[in-house]
Amino acid sequence: VKDGVYPAPDVFVFAMGSNDTKLDGVAEALSARTLDDVNVTTMAGGARWAIQTILENFPECRVFVWLPIQTGDKAKNEMHRKRNEVLRQVSQALSVQVIDCYGESGISQFFENSNTRGRYLKDGVHPDIEGQRLIGRYIAKEIRNNFF
């Protein structure tokens, strides 16, 4: 994009957090003065660095952060709730919109199974074709309704 071959983006959607494990460091990531001071080995630091880099390079671009979905596994869902809180804090600090796929996409832990096919997840974690369509329609609606 920077070399002019592609146009500057109007919208950028981050889908991040599903596999992150280093969830500490939110205050540190948000208090760093510059991106060079951010510890990118933490989820919060990596999210801040990635989002802020897009915002600095493309100030007219509207940025959205897509939160991880519910799964068929209780322990994974607990981790996703923690990850989602980190992403919410970083997103709020950078004033970018959160797309709450965890709580609003239509994929619910009550209809999914751990390690086997459920309503929309083929293995309890990853969406099947119908799940992908469901999430895609939800995200498209959120972008359309909130793009200004």
Model-found features: residue ranges?
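Alpha-helical cap/lid subdomain in secreted, periplasmic
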Residues: 1-148
